[in-house]
């Protein structure tokens, strides 16, 4: 079992990942991205897919034309863990 | 404005696209796919993305690890059109 984030780690999220917000009905973080068109959105998704495989941690995500929504949570933790923070930081590094 | 499917065309969907079902709260069709892992799921998504660009018609879709859900509807028709059928048939051709 992977440990969930502590209260102190959660409090630090606002500064650490200012573009991400806590999901409403899940112990998860999410971020929405908008691009010029589908081609740019899917190019970004491809880079995120490579990151996900590298981290062995995968997003729950959706795409509608130029928009991409990414939700991160850790199944083996039953909620947010350090793995989500690391992947979110890596994704932010692309954007 | 693109014409929506007629009643006769809708009645034919069961035979034409047996793997697809009507969405519950949208005038749309959807299909769920399951793969061995994320890598296979995303490889499939990449092929669907190429089809979407070729057809100039894009899915609303989501992915969680090995699962992919695709919903097709035509914004410019306010619901299902022949474009959705053509793209669904092309996607079935990959699977």
UniProtKB/Swiss-Prot annotation, chains A, B:
Family affiliation: Belongs to the pterin-4-alpha-carbinolamine dehydratase family.
Gene Ontology MF annotations: 4-alpha-hydroxytetrahydrobiopterin dehydratase activity
Disulfide bonds: none
Keyword check for Lyase: yes
Full protein name: Putative pterin-4-alpha-carbinolamine dehydratase
Reactions performed catalytically: (4aS,6R)-4a-hydroxy-L-erythro-5,6,7,8-tetrahydrobiopterin = (6R)-L-erythro-6,7-dihydrobiopterin + H2O
Highest taxon of source: Bacteria
Membrane spanning residue stretches: none
Protein keywords: Lyase
GO BP terms, alphabetized: tetrahydrobiopterin biosynthetic process
InterPro entries referenced in this protein's UniProt entry, alphabetically: PCD_sf (IPR036428), Pterin_deHydtase (IPR001533)
Annotated EC: 4.2.1.96
Root EC class: lyase
KW Amino-acid biosynthesis (keyword) present: no
């Amino acid at each position: 079992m992977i440990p969930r984030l502590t209260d102190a780690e959660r409090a630090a999220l606002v500064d650490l990942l200012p573009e991400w917000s806590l999901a409403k009905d899940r112990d998860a973080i999410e971020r929405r991205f908008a691009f010029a068109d589908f081609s740019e959105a899917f190019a970004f998704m491809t880079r995120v897919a490579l990151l996900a495989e590298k981290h062995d941690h995968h997003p729950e995500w959706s795409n509608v034309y130029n928009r991409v929504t990414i939700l991160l949570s850790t199944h083996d933790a039953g909620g947010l863990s350090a793995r989500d923070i690391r992947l979110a930081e890596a994704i932010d590094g692309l954007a």
